[in-house]
């Protein structure tokens, strides 16, 4: 399939482009303001990038237009897509349809710390040999790219493509349960900003995660949200999509998130926070600057972290990822 991505230089849409390319699609795109790190990533991936919103930038043979949320009605490219009756979809919906089915989606939501927490969680899974897929709102130094499909490949619907031949026997055997789950996790930075000009829901409601981290909640995005309550409603919609077999990892110190859970919750909740509160997961600072801390789970110390990052906020990001 050939895709044109409108708004391709945004951190989210650039990640969508990387995933589409890895899946074997032909990918091109256009944007107005193009600069690193996304411009560098797109160039390294060999993706054609055209400047500006002229409808001439969209190849006539594109099968689908993927629309970023930075584009509104009145944008020349958007108006031409609508006038021509071209097939279009939002980036969040494309991700939900093309990448997330069959995966254990781990969504990282919150006003602050999403990119850091998503990166830490992905790194932990990678270090554990899980080969996760991911979409991060930036290019993490550990990975060199903002998005990757990961090691998981769903079983083929064809004749036993997913079976492993036994050497010298011409027979096949199914992979072990553990092997079949390698790479099944997909970690996504889950943004509360709206999806597209035609879909004003928060992007994260598309992802239907098995596990959601709710890192914090403050008033933000004044251009689309009237007040904190409006953002809380979107977080409530996210909570409603997490199955009862999943988990919610919630900042136990955040009163706005407590109010979200009070609106309704059907999923087991594990709370995290710094020492001094009654949480499932606690960080006890060894160094006041956050460069060393003890991780405590249900009152039992399970290990000490020493790392180069500083600050209480980064300790909370790490604790959420570990939980």
What role is predicted for each listed range?
Residues 212-215, 246-250:
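Conserved beta-strand/loop subsegment of P-loop NTPase cores
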Residues 73-93, 206-215, 232-239, 268-272:
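A short, gly/pro- and small-residue-rich
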